[in-house]
Every structure is written in structure tokens, then in C-alpha cells.
Amino acid sequence: MKNINPTQTAAWQALQQHFEQMKEVHIADLFANDANRFAAFSATFDDRMLVDYSKNRITSETLEKLQALAKETDLQSAIKSMFSGEKINRTEDRAVLHVALRNRSNTPIVVDGKDVMPEVNAVLAKMKAFSERIISGEWKGFTGKAITDVVNIGIGGSDLGPFMVTEALRPYKNHLKMHFVSNVDGTHIAETLKMLSPETTLFLVASKTFTTQETMTNAHSAREWFLTSGQQQDVAKHFAALSTNGEAVSEFGIDTDNMFEFWDWVGGRYSLWSAIGLSIALSIGYENFEKLLSGAHAMDRHFADTPEEKNLPILLALIGIWYNNFFGAETEAILPYDQYMHRFAAYFQQGNMESNGKYVDRAGNPVSYQTGPIIWGEPGTNGQHAFYQLIHQGTKLVPCDFIAPAVSHNQLGDHHSKLLSNFFAQTEALAFGKSREVVEKEFADAGKDAQSVEHIVPFKVFEGNRPTNSILLRDITPYSLGALIAMYEHKIFTQGAILNIFTFDQWGVELGKQLASRILPELADAAEVSSHDGSTNGLINLYKSWR
């Protein structure tokens, strides 16, 4: 990947000039001037997904200039580098190949002169065999009973992805009950174990190194709980490992035959497609897990092969850069109108902020422009009764992605029609608003005297011109969810490539862990500490006096 400062390109300068022409343009006028705007500013994927980006503060000229930025920063070369196994994560000297995990075409992908696909396929085959034994009941616990509950113990990418997907695909789940434990706060594991029986519980310990503090603390507590009923030799029937550290796995008591490997070129927040997704395969069955991979692979091909003007991840990435760097928008909201998707925003909060929350470029120099945005969101319509007020009438510009399926898995009365009426209404309201004239007319039509309501009119005005993307899926299936996740992954990659940052490391998580490891021994006794700054000393000493 090349090291090109985007602000030094001719395209960036052209975008700055273009912004001066666009900053006061209203979305309503863009529609008024172009009867075909929806058709021109939307694109489909596989006849299963439509992305409508027409309600944005953009014109065809805007997109041309943004695409020129992608060309001048050599985005296509970066895409080829990732797909070909080049070590684009240079700070850790690693390839970035989550695309290999779902490479359903099985074409060779080479890292260090070796095709990785045979190993990928071997782990998938092992996951298939294992999941089928658990689901069928062939696998027995230490008292001869079948497994009924599965507890995934992980954190970050080893938790967020599998949890999000198993929730999003609950309509496809089998009889196994899934539980996810991540927080080192003992409450999380304690509350989970209260409802379980050691005889019928399987634990998946997800840690590449088998040393992650939070995960291993929870894993040891789970083992202690298990050993109140079972024996040490029974651990192997109730614990499996998603790891690469065979020695540590064996020492823990897990049979290495039940260790599922993944590789350095699998980043944590891109790992649900790997052995880390074993909980997904157990929840929805391996066949559906394969469909998830297939949907993601189809989006990979779309991303790699589709021209930029119709390439969904690239379009979304460019529009995001437009708002973040030219309009000064600091956040993006992800708003799924589907209750099963309630963890989707949280998943891509990590996916985006841990990937592109960087302040130095690929040359190690501080940047003079905006990199990753703040990502947040909740399912609709709950968010409408929480934070939409600020999106509609606040002083912050918050570009939003609205996501909804046309067909619900629960055809309950008119629930889905009501849900989707809100989905359509919100993007219309955000784009077009309600003028003072309309507010005054509504009062007049209601028989109100203009003078008597004059004081309230300003509060009922909606300026509009708030940008949104609408992502409409036929329905949420393993295949379509896989494609949707991959689309957002590639959007994040595209933004990082153009903005000249390393997307696939996460050094920002290290300092806090390092300091915590120094503080932990200081909490072992009641002695006052004085080795930190005044605030930290004061907090630690008060904690010691209160505990």
C-alpha cells in the first residue's frame, strides 16, 4: 500500500472548492431538480439489497470528485494488495485475509509462498464435524447427557461478532441455548452460570494466545464451577478452545483435538468467519454458517470487481469521508429497524473505531485531517424515543444509516408495516424537514389564530437537510447478513486506505492494559499507594478504604 497524504492530492483541493458550493445546498432542492435522483443515486446487490444514497448532500459532481480522490490515493492497488495476501498490516507484519476465511471459490490465496486455503478448509471441516456432534446429541457430557447450553467466553472480536450474528439470526437457531461472557467483572460469569447445569454445558474459550486476561479469568472461574460437580478428566468433555496455543490449551485440561485454530492474518474484529464463529455454527447449524460465509464472499467479489461508481462499500466510504472531513460531522449513527439486529451498531462501533481511530498516518506522522468517526446507534423505533430529537433538531450533523428488511421473520399483525412506516418516514423527515410556512398552515387548518401560536412556531420547525443512507434488504438471512457485514468491513477498509492509516492494528488498546498490570499487584493489600499521579493515587486509596 502506498503512502499518500490525501490532503496533498489535487482531488482533495477540488473537493474543498466543491464543498464551498455545496455547503448550503438543500437535499430538497436536489430532488426538485432531478426527477430521476433515486434511480441515479441508488445501487443494488444480488437482487437482495438496495442501498439508497440519494438523501445525501451530494451531486454527481461530488461523487466524481470523491472517486478521483480514491484513484489518486490508489485505492484499487490497496484492494488488490489485501486480496493477494500482501502484509498490509505493516506495524505487525501481517497479511489481512478475513476474505480467505469465506473464499467459497477456493481459489488459492498465498501468504509467504503458501496457499492458506487447505488449512482454512481443514478447520471448517473440523468445525462442521464438531458442531454436528453437539447439535445431534451424539456428544455427551460427563454424566452421559447431551449438551443443552453453550457458553462462549471471549472479549472484543471473540465476543462481539459471534454474539451479534447469533442474535441477528435467532430465527434460524436450533435447540441449543447460547450464552456469551466477556466482561472480567465477575457479575457477568456469575449471573450466566446461575442458570446452567455442569452436566449439560459446553464452554468455548476464545483466545488466540490463551493468555487474554479477561477471557482466561472467566475461563478459570468456569472451570472451578464445573469442577464442583465434575472431575478434572471430565473437563475435556465440556470445554473446547478457539486458540493457537496448544500447550496452554492442554495444560488447562482441554483436549487439543477440540482446539480450533486460526491465524495471525485473522484480525480479532474480523474473526467471526473463522473458528471464532464456532458458536454461530453451533447456534444455527453448519449449513447456515456456510451461507453466512457465502454471502460475505459474494460481497467480497462485488467489492473487488465492481466499478467504483456502483461499488457499495466504496460509495458508502466516500460519502462518509465527505461528511467527516468537509462538513465536520464527527459521528455516524447505524439504525437497524429489526430487533434481531440489536447488536449490529455495537459490533461496527468496534469494527470502525478500533480500525480507523488512528492519529498517525502510514509514515508515522500525525495527520492534519479526520480519520475514523464515532459510531453509535440503537434499533428503531426505540431510538426515535431516545436520541432522534438531536438528529432532527440539534446542532450536530449526524449522518445515519437506516437498515431494514422488507420481510419480517415474525408476521405478527401489522407490526412490520408500522415499523417500516417509521423507517421510511424518518429518512423523509430528516431530508426534507418541515418549514415555518407548513407549521403555520397546519395551525391555521386546525383553526388556531396565528397570533396565539406565534410563540410556539419556531419549536415545530424542522430544518431538514440531514443526510441518510437507506439499506433495504429483502429479508435477513445468513446469506444477506453475511453480505451486509462484509459491505461494512470493506467500507472501513476503503476509508483507511484513502486516509493513509493502518486499519488492521489496534495499539490504542495496549497502554491501559499495561498500566492495569502494574496496578493490579498494588491492590493486593491495604497499603496506601503514592506511585501515580494525585488523582489515580486518590482513587486507589479510596477504593482500598471502601472495599
Curated annotation (Swiss-Prot):
User: Which InterPro entries does this entry report, sorted A to Z?
Assistant: G6P_Isomerase, G6P_Isomerase_C, Phosphoglucose_isomerase_CS, SIS_dom_sf, SIS_PGI_1, SIS_PGI_2
Active site as annotated: 354, 385, 513
Q: Which Pfam families match?
A: PGI
Q: Which domain of life is it from?
A: Bacteria
UniProt lists the family membership as follows: Belongs to the GPI family.
Q: Which GO terms describe its biological process?
A: gluconeogenesis; glucose 6-phosphate metabolic process; glycolytic process
Q: Where in the cell is it found?
A: Cytoplasm
Name the pathway it acts in. Carbohydrate biosynthesis; gluconeogenesis; Carbohydrate degradation; glycolysis; D-glyceraldehyde 3-phosphate and glycerone phosphate from D-glucose: step 2/4
- Name assigned to this protein: Glucose-6-phosphate isomerase
Keywords from UniProt, A to Z, are:
Cytoplasm, Gluconeogenesis, Glycolysis, Isomerase
Mostly located where? cytoplasm
Q: What is its EC number?
A: 5.3.1.9
Q: Which gene encodes it?
A: pgi
Sum up the protein's function in the record's words: Catalyzes the reversible isomerization of glucose-6-phosphate to fructose-6-phosphate.
Q: Name one GO molecular function term.
A: monosaccharide binding
Show the catalytic activity. Answer: alpha-D-glucose 6-phosphate = beta-D-fructose 6-phosphate
GO terms under cellular component = cytosol
